[in-house]
Design a protein with these regions (language model features):
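Conserved motor-coupling elements within RecA-like helicase/translocase cores
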Residues: 17-53, 64-67
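Flexible beta-alpha connector loops of hexameric P-loop NTPases
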Residues: 26-35, 77-88, 150-158
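A short beta-strand-to-loop transition that corresponds to the Sensor-1 phosphate-sensing loop
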Residues: 7-8, 56-58, 74, 109-112, ...
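SF2 helicase catalytic motif II
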Residues: 51, 58-106
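Conserved Walker A/P-loop ATP-binding site and its immediately adjacent core
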Residues: 1-18, 37
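Switch/connector loops and helix/strand junctions flanking conserved nucleotide-binding motifs
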Residues: 11-14, 36-39, 62-63, 78-81, ...
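Conserved interdomain linker/interface between the two RecA-like ATPase lobes of SF2 helicase motors
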Residues: 91-167
Length: 167
């Protein structure tokens, strides 16, 4: 399994959760590690000694012998987008890898990206699972997409839809 977190700072708590379940088969990969540390983790994954990789977007490229699951935590975060060459979005690479290997792909977010929401509507392979309440028990907020082209077509010059202004 590959588990992506948007920030290196989130790695320790995520790693500890997975280590409590999977023990020493969990590898960690991120850019703050030395080249030697990254190589050791990469090699342990390649040899099958580590079966779960937790890290930032570069963790996607670990040589997993068998890949059954990819999890992207907080999939809406912009940090999953690589701006310098080679340019890629970790979500798109993960989707391609999952399709190619038959792995399950789980995108987690309380506020999913528009791209992911759209894909769930138009692609039968993508399914949206909505939790009815938050972890703290509070209800989820109502979310609606408003068509600003219609607002402007009605002569509005505001950057906020009338529906937002009325509430």
């Amino acid at each position: 399994a590959i588990v992506l977190v948007p920030e290196i700072a989130l790695s320790p708590q995520t790693v500890s959760r997975f280590e409590s379940r999977f023990g020493d088969t969990v590898a960690v990969m991120h850019s703050r590690m030395t080249a030697g540390e990254r190589f050791d983790q990469w090699e342990a994954v390649r040899l099958g000694k580590k079966r779960v990789v937790v890290g930032a977007r570069s963790a996607l490229f670990c040589p997993m012998a068998t890949l059954g699951l990819i999890i992207i935590d907080e999939e809406h975060e912009s940090t999953y987008k690589q701006e310098s060459a080679p340019r890629y979005h970790a979500r798109d690479v993960a989707a391609w890898m999952a399709q190619r290997t038959g792995a399950a792909l789980v995108l987690g977010s309380a506020t999913p990206s528009i791209e992911t929401l759209c894909r769930c509507k138009v692609d039968d392979m993508w399914h949206r699972v909505v939790l009815p309440t938050r972890a703290n028990g509070k209800p989820m907020p109502e979310v609606r997409i408003l068509d600003m082209a219609k607002e402007f077509g009605r002569g509005s010059r505001s950057m906020f839809a009338k529906e937002l202004q009325d509430n």
